[in-house]
Amino acid sequence: MSLFSAVEMAPRDPILGLNEAFNADTRPGKINLGVGVYYNEEGRLPLLRAVQAAEKARIEAHAPRGYLPIEGIAAYDQGVQKLLFGADSELLAEGRVVTTQAVGGTGALKTGADFLKRLLPNATVAISDPSWENHRALFEAAGFPVQNYRYYDAATHGVNRAGLLEDLNALPSQSIVVLHACCHNPTGVDLSMDDWRQVLDVLKAKGHVPFLDIAYQGFGDGIDEDAAAVRLFAKSGLNFFVSSSFSKSFSLYGERVGALSVVTNSREESGRVLSQVKRVIRTNYSNPPTHGASVVASVLNSPELRAMWEDELGEMRGRIRTMREAMVAQLAAQGAKRDFGFVAQQRGMFSYSGLTAEQVERLKDEFGIYAVGTGRICVAALNNGNLDTVTRAITQVL
């Protein structure tokens, strides 16, 4: 008998599996609104000018490709800290933030989860309902029980504030609470600053450990604006975790450029925490890759390239906002049987469209338009060339 005779076929990843189905579809004119990737107006992945300039300089320097330190490139880690906490952050001045380069946002989450399992082995993890599909899998793989807290209100297309606060308060003390710092995935519905303050009050009262996930900084309202929750928590006195990613904001998806940041109580404590996080990394992938983080570090630490990148990020953010507004206008003009005005109020790359699983299936079968079964669509995949096709198809399946 084979060692693998009892191995069962794993279910397809709901997002990446959708991409596989899309690639296998031979119909011309098919449209993929499922994958979480920013496409430009021409329907292509952009190669940012700031990234091209940084890569050109790196190639011309003929830099050696030795092993990086376990925690990654120092200039990269410092650039991440300033982007998240602000260049004038007291926490940074006091040495109270530990940042390590990670293999994408996913690697940052898993490293943080593995470290937390050593600190709080009996803790419960809570994620929003709904949340990014991999949040549950990552924390369950680290050995934690995972449950949901209420977040999205389908009736209002907004936040279920009362349910959110009630569920956070009902969690066992010292639970680990995963929060989307901005551009909530999959709903596009974010907390207001007043909401954040109320959430913070509950977390402090219950002794919960916040784990902020920020994969879309700059895609909501701006780089500093989208870091507002992180900076609010930085003033709270709490210890907390932040996972961050540059896949979207630098269009470096395949380079897996992320970071884990941990807020401590002192410089001395930071040293001990860093030593333990490095042990986790060493037993997972030893040390991170060089190229993507080198590019990001060069851009963040060069005033000229930083300004160029911020302009390009602003263009991407503006195009998504334009597509949201155009989608709402097109659906209304085509006589859609419901009001989609809420789509224009959402933030980031995604929209919780309100489409049912059956309607999403019809979009795929009848029109070759792929979306996630929950009704999540990637607004960043829309453009002036496919918007009319998409909105007409949505109108027909309602």
Spans of model-derived segments:
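Conserved PLP-binding catalytic core of the aspartate aminotransferase-like
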Residues: 310-366
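Structural signature of PLP-dependent enzymes
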Residues: 274-292, 299-328
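Hydrophobic "anchor" residues on beta-strands that sit immediately upstream
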Residues: 176, 209, 241
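N-terminal "arm"/small-domain region of PLP-dependent enzymes with the aminotransferase-like
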Residues: 2-72, 79-82, 283, 289, ...
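Active-site PLP attachment segment
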Residues: 229-272, 276
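Conserved core of the PLP fold type I
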Residues: 52, 57, 62-204, 218-219, ...
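Short beta-strands and strand-loop turn motifs
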Residues: 32-35, 148-150, 177-182, 211-214, ...
